[in-house]
């Protein structure tokens, strides 16, 4: 099985449905023999540019280990779900389990950029 990083954006009016969507997609992954290494709900965030005249969207990040069939099933689910505005699935070399920079407190992020 391969490792993937998935980010999908949900219509801001459908934010209350996000926990159900996450549960549904998690079940799809687990039933296909996959594993979720990291799951982060980033909440509503400003978009870099308007999509369908919207300026905000609800973001969700998943790092999973799954077969290609499961990933194809997720892609199909994203495509036919009208609430999902955009999605991105990237193949990774290894699993990523540490928290993403977006979930760190702002003080920690400032310290990281100064140290670089």
From Swiss-Prot:
SUPFAM superfamilies, alphabetized: Ribosomal protein S6
InterPro entries recorded: Ribosomal_bS6 (IPR000529), Ribosomal_bS6_CS (IPR020815), Ribosomal_bS6_sf (IPR035980), Ribosomal_S6_plastid/chlpt (IPR020814), Transl_elong_EF1B/ribsomal_bS6 (IPR014717)
Pfam families hit by this protein: Ribosomal_S6
Superkingdom of source: Bacteria
Signal peptide: none
Transmembrane segments: none
Matching CDD domains: bS6
Record keywords, A-Z: Ribonucleoprotein, Ribosomal protein, RNA-binding, rRNA-binding
One GO cellular component, as annotated: cytosolic small ribosomal subunit
GO molecular function: small ribosomal subunit rRNA binding; structural constituent of ribosome
Residue spans of biased composition, Basic and acidic residues class: 104-116
Segments for region (Disordered): 94-116
GO term, biological process aspect, one: translation
Gene3D superfamilies: 3.30.70.60
PANTHER family, per database record: MITOCHONDRIAL 28S RIBOSOMAL PROTEIN S6, SMALL RIBOSOMAL SUBUNIT PROTEIN BS6M
Function: Binds together with bS18 to 16S ribosomal RNA.
NCBIfam families documented for this protein: S6 (TIGR00166)
Similarity comment text for this entry: Belongs to the bacterial ribosomal protein bS6 family.
HAMAP family associated with the record: Ribosomal_bS6 (MF_00360)
Protein known as: Small ribosomal subunit protein bS6
Lineage per the UniProt record: Bacteria, Pseudomonadati, Pseudomonadota, Gammaproteobacteria, Alteromonadales
């Amino acid at each position: 099985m391969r490792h993937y990083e998935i980010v999908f954006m949900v219509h801001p009016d459908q934010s209350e449905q996000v926990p159900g969507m996450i549960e549904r997609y998690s079940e799809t992954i687990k039933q296909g023999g996959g594993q979720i290494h990291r799951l982060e709900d980033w909440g509503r965030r400003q978009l870099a540019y308007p999509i369908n005249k919207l300026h905000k969207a609800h973001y969700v990040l998943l790092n999973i280990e799954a077969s290609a069939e499961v990933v194809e099933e997720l892609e199909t689910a994203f495509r036919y779900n009208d609430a999902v505005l955009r999605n991105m699935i990237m193949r990774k070399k290894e699993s990523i389990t540490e928290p993403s920079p977006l979930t760190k407190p702002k003080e920690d992020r400032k310290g990281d950029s100064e140290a670089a």
